C-alpha cells in the first residue's frame, strides 16, 4: 500500500466579478466564458451568476475574486471565496 498523506481535491476554481455584496456573508459572482456557436463558429459570450460564501465580508461590488466549489452551505450556495485577486478603488 502506498502512503497517501496528500489530500487530493477535484474542486473547481473559477474567477469572476462581484456583482452584489448586499447579503450578509454572501456575494454574487458573475462568471463569463466564451462558447463557440455550433454552426457558424462565432465566439459567443455566456455568463453565469453564482452565489458564494464570504465569511468575513471582505468583498465589495466590482472586485475580481477567485471562488472554489465546496459542500452545500445553503439552498443556493455551494461555493466559497478563496481570495480577492483585485480590489476595486473607492471613489
Swiss-Prot record:
GO molecular function, one term: structural constituent of ribosome
Top-level taxon in the UniProt lineage: Bacteria
Record keywords, A-Z: Ribonucleoprotein, Ribosomal protein, RNA-binding, rRNA-binding
Gene Ontology terms: cellular component: cytosolic small ribosomal subunit
Oligomeric and partner information: Part of the 30S ribosomal subunit.
HAMAP family: Ribosomal_uS17_B
Protein name (Swiss-Prot/TrEMBL): Small ribosomal subunit protein uS17
Native organism: Psychrobacter cryohalolentis (strain ATCC BAA-1226 / DSM 17306 / VKM B-2378 / K5)
This protein's encoding gene: rpsQ
